[in-house]
Amino acid sequence: MSRTRRFSGTRPGRSMAALAVVLVGLGGACQMFDQDDEPARTTPERPPGSRSEQPDATESPGAGEGIDLREAEVPDDHPIEHVVFIVKENRTYDNYFARYPGGEGTRTGQTSDGRTVELSVAPDVQEPDLGHSFFDGIIAINGGRMDGYDQILNGEDLAGYNSFTRKGIPNYWAYADNFVLGDHHFSSMYGPTFPEHLYTVGGQAADVVGNKLQTNAPGGYCDDPGETVYRFINMTKKEQNEVMRAERRVDLDTVGNFWEEVRACFDFEVIQDQLTANDISWHYYADEGSWMNALLAIKHMRFSKHWGRDITEEEQFMEDITSENLDEVTWVVPGPGVNEHPGGPSVCMGENWTVDHVNAIMRSKYWKSTVIFITWDDFGGFYDHVPPPQTDHMGLGPRSPLLVISPWAKQGFVDDTVTEPSSVLALIEEIHGLDCLTHRDCNASNLAQVFDFDQPASAPKDRKLILEERSCEGLPARISAQYEKHGDDAFRALGD
């Protein structure tokens, strides 16, 4: 099935005169270009992850002139033998770390009518869910102004203009105090969940721009021939440049006119293919049928020997740690109830899940050779004030937090290097000598800058940070009762 969609946007595009779009640069530097002018162009090192010709990137980090974010290298004698990539849901950097000392945060936000408002203290349970679709991301960014968060779904009352304090997420802040916090880590695209997760395994999303259109059940993807998604049509370079300009001026009609409806099952190369070809063990832990299970939408993975062996339910991760069966590269995708998705799940319970899993790794024999990356897949409708680079027609999207936890990570280090989820793929490729997959991971920072391999041999023992899980008292009665009765299954009906 492939139906070209001539789209009429549900939200009108804003009329904008020529204006300067500010794109953040390394170390806080900025570059500017007029929206109606053709920006400077560069060509990536390798072909893009798309059926289209390679788009021309705007003058921005990760694609800008003279910037090579992959020049940092991990030494050949590095001690990293295990990479654990934990992908949670729907938070921005400013939502979790706007108040964190030393980071690129803010206490205020900008609204579409020109006001400056104080960011309120974030609630543990955010209800209702906030808009975080592809269009919502474009609207929120508003051509780099970062003032459209009150124009997205359920954002009218400034519901997304809030941030946590240390008291609200003490253990995440403790990890930042003792390891690495990335404050210029951007989500892969404007949103939402499903295609964002595709980037975590493939450095691309097959140009998909939304979750499946059938919302009556969790994702079946390659198991369900009736499930469809919208994605960009196969575009020429000229058409991609037209789309990118339309995104900057929030012309949703023009952007949507390049979409088509296709089946939600794809067959592009993922990094697991390269790991398998090079005899590097890997495991992808995600609940079958979950909205977030990216490999369920990759045909040659879903119908392969890997399914049920290397791709299993999330809860098996803890069993494998206990039985000393951790693979070299691991993805862990928590399910509803503990993934911190707005609209029901508790951040406190989600943070406890993270602490439980990180503690298990620290107590295991693997800690001395492991790096853990924790990030959140998309912006979730929450405010963030730093304009993302526009590297192609998919994004980047607003910032999301990145925590790097390892005995070999720098201590209390705030990394201002521009990164994205493909940066984790770039590190895996650097460590194991693999080829990159798309222009995203080819050009992304490989995160080598967050490590200190000159630490003494006792570092793994000295740098364990076993944290206590918190009591999640004070939750709304409905949420508390559901969780007490059903545990992690309490929120599955809510979906993601």
Enumerate the language-model features and the residues they cover.
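C-terminal motif of bacterial Sec signal peptides marking the signal peptidase cleavage site
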Residues: 26-29
